[in-house]
Amino acid sequence: MRARAVVVLVAGLLIPAGAMAAPTPAPTTRGVDYQIVPPAPRDVHRNANGPDTLFLNRCVGGCTVLPGGNDARTNHSSIPTTTANLSEFPFSDDDWNAVVACVTETYQPYGVDVVTTEPASGDYVEAMVAGTPDQMGLDATTLGIAPMTSDCTPQASAIAFAFAGNHGGQGYLLDLCATVAHEAGHVYGLDHEFDCKDPMTYLVGCGQKYFLNVAAPCGEFDGPRNCRCTGPTQNSHVKLSAVLGVGTLPAGPTVTIPYPADGAMVDNSFSIFGEVAEDRVLDRVEFWLNGWPWKTEDGDRDRDTYSYTAPANLPDGVIDVEVRAYNDLELMGVDVVTVTKGEACTSAATCLDGQQCSDGRCAWPEPTGEIGDACERDADCMSRKCGSDGNVQLCTDYCLLGIEGSCGDGYSCLAAGADTGVCWPSELTVGEPTGCCSAGEGAGGGPAPWLLGA
């Protein structure tokens, strides 16, 4: 069997110019270096296929890196050609703590412990956050470097380098955090992504970066390209979840309804505004009225305010207005206000077909159908999503593609779009799928078709 080759990938993340907060300004250009070297043997790990400890080393008193092979336990690296000595992290303790906290948050959704004390035993990935590239014989534009296997499998015990002394300018700590996460990502098998919100990017801006649950094209500065191992796109969140396991998921978006005000009297076709704050990326925003989703709008990275005009046929009465926002991890944030349109209902006679009047509100009965239960329309399902594979119609819900256990026992997450998955009974997914259906929008109608991939 031929040995896998290791590709050494250099991060050239640019840092905006500004008031200097570091000893030297960051480079304004970057170079890319690919170096093929033999891989080190890998052991089997308890967390999926990869290591579960990421050691951040500030190199107090300096670090010595020995050439040859990749083994964090013995400070060996395939990157330098001779023994290299890296100077220690050049900034304050507060700065170090900020970088550690940022990297920890970035890797929080995965089964890896970010530590600052070298493990006494076992395999681990190390990120040396110290020194400058010239101390390893590298080009001055290099902000970080790490080995990556040519087949994108994770390495057991390798060193990634984030040259802290080469980071400066406005926002240098956030950029240094991104470089650390980026270089460790290469050790875990991630390629570069052409998406400025993901740590695996070379693109600048977009604030703090997170490993995103999106199918992103790969690439550096010159536009998208095919990924080394995954075809036209890469999903960094799915990759790390498979390599490291699932960690602690963050909170969902923060949602505020500035209008209408809670307790307000509203007219026909009243406007609803929702303000959404989300550090990751927003997948969608839903507008619910008295327990039913009347409108779903795709999330926009450059937008934080969403609006909806209530339909003219919305019955008079007390109305609970909800704005729900979901990020790329399907984590939800919600805000609720209660308003009154006209007079509160006193019977179902003034409500829409199938609705009941309760406590002055016109609303459809709360559905009882769980995922996998038979359904005829969205209103039969607690998820408000009735799907069909062409043979049967069942209640379903959104799920995270590629994440094991996203749907629970007995169910699989099937593709219903580039980044969209739905839960379907595993016993019905054997062989080639025939298609499935999505929830209809509005007053509880039947589903509209979507194609489920294998």
Residue ranges and their predicted role:
Residues V7-A17:
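Bacterial N-terminal signal peptides
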Residues A21-N85, P90:
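Primarily auto-inhibitory N-terminal propeptides
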Residues I36-P39, V44-T53, C59, F91-E193, ...:
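Metzincin-family zinc-dependent endopeptidase catalytic domain
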Residues A251-E343:
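Long, low-complexity serine/threonine/glycine- and acidic-rich segments characteristic of extracellular
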Residues G342-G435:
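Secreted, cysteine-rich disulfide-bonded mini-domains of extracellular proteins
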Residues P433-G446:
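Extracellular Ser/Thr-rich, low-complexity/disordered mucin-like segments
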